[in-house]
């Protein structure tokens, strides 16, 4: 079968080695004669999977011992509600930084539970979309926490700065599309959450990293399945977890460790982004409208000089084995999502196609 490179924003491409192992084990996992999807989540075999997955995840991100790691349902949108329900305590407001679509979605959900103090960080610099630096973010004195999204998949905007607002500011962040792609200092955050379907594994699993002193503050109306304390007390098994997603994510963690960990991913992701943005910047046929300081390394939106060629570009790229390049309806054009599992070879195939397409149609 011809090599297919999947540039989907999520569910996203998974490492070929991981898929091959899962395929081999699908009907006879661990010598049990059954699939991992069929075994009890409370059986010793799956407990081992769960424990190894958490340990490997902690190792990859150097998660400090005073942080809990939870494997949850509900996706990022579930956490839009879970964060205020768990962290507000007796306060009624929280700071929210708006830098794009997903930050705005979190703000909309938070309004059900508190009065968000919204800081619009979006700005235009030399005609390009950008984000104000953290030094200019205006935070309130009475907020329970500050929330932001480090990587906006739709807008192709990244905030790579490390938060430094002082020890009294609880920082909550949606790392769904950038987790494990580069080193992060977990100790600078109160809550980190990430849907699995981009850099972790298949859809259906969400990972939460929460500082232990923030547990035990959940609103009385918080659903039990979103209560961090309950999930922690039950080892993320308050109800039946998404076991297959948990298992497959564990395989991804082992793949990451075998390939040099997050530091190695950071380097290769930089190479991939530089290659793709280089073709865009050295062309009058393609353009990206994000300021270089805020360009995402995970999600690269770009437009053609003549939008009438969009349909042909998508048809020909698909035929060439370059799939899921259509941009989000909000932005249009094209978008290449190049998460950890996308090899440099895939980005090279895309850039070669782009150069050839421009030669024929530019």
Curated annotation (Swiss-Prot):
An individual GO BP term: pyridoxine biosynthetic process
Enzyme class (EC, first level): transferase
EC annotation from Swiss-Prot or TrEMBL: 2.6.1.52
Disulfide bond sites: none
Gene Ontology MF terms in the entry: O-phospho-L-serine:2-oxoglutarate aminotransferase activity; pyridoxal phosphate binding
Oxidoreductase keyword on record: no
Subcellular compartments: Cytoplasm
The protein's name: Phosphoserine aminotransferase
Lineage, opening ranks: Bacteria, Pseudomonadati, Pseudomonadota, Gammaproteobacteria, Enterobacterales
């Amino acid at each position: 079968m011809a090599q297919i490179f999947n540039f989907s924003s999520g569910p996203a491409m998974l490492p070929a080695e991981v898929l091959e192992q899962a395929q081999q084990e699908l009907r006879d996992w661990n010598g049990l004669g059954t699939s991992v999807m069929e075994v009890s989540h409370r059986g010793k075999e799956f407990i081992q999977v769960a424990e190894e997955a958490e340990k490997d995840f902690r190792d990859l991100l150097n998660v400090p011992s005073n942080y809990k790691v939870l494997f949850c349902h509900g996706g990022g949108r579930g956490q839009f509600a879970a964060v205020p329900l768990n962290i507000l305590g007796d306060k009624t407001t929280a700071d929210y930084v708006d830098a794009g679509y997903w930050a705005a979605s979190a703000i909309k959900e938070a309004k059900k539970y508190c009065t968000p103090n919204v800081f619009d960080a979006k700005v235009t610099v030399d005609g390009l979309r950008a984000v104000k630096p953290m030094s200019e973010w205006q935070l309130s004195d009475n907020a329970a926490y500050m929330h932001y999204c480090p990587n906006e998949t739709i807008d192709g905007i990244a905030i790579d700065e490390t938060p430094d607002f002082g020890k009294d500011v609880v920082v909550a962040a949606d790392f769904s599309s950038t987790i494990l792609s580069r080193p992060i200092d977990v100790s600078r955050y109160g809550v980190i959450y990430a849907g699995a379907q981009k850099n972790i594994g298949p859809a259906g699993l969400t990972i939460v990293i929460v500082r232990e002193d923030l547990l035990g503050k959940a609103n009385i109306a918080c659903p039990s399945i979103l209560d961090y304390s309950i999930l922690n007390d039950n080892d993320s098994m308050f109800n039946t977890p998404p076991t297959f997603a948990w298992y497959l994510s564990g395989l991804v963690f082992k793949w990451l460790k075998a390939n040099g960990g997050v530091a190695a991913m950071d380097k290769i992701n930089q190479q991939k982004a530089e290659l793709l943005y280089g073709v865009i910047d050295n062309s009058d046929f393609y353009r990206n409208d994000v300021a270089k300081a805020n360009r995402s390394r995970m999600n690269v939106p770009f437009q053609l000089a003549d939008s009438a060629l969009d349909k042909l570009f998508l048809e020909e790229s698909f035929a060439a084995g370059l799939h899921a390049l259509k941009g989000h309806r909000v932005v249009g054009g094209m978008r290449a999502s190049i998460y950890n599992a996308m090899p440099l070879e895939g980005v090279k195939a895309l850039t070669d196609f782009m150069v050839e397409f421009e030669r024929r149609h530019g």
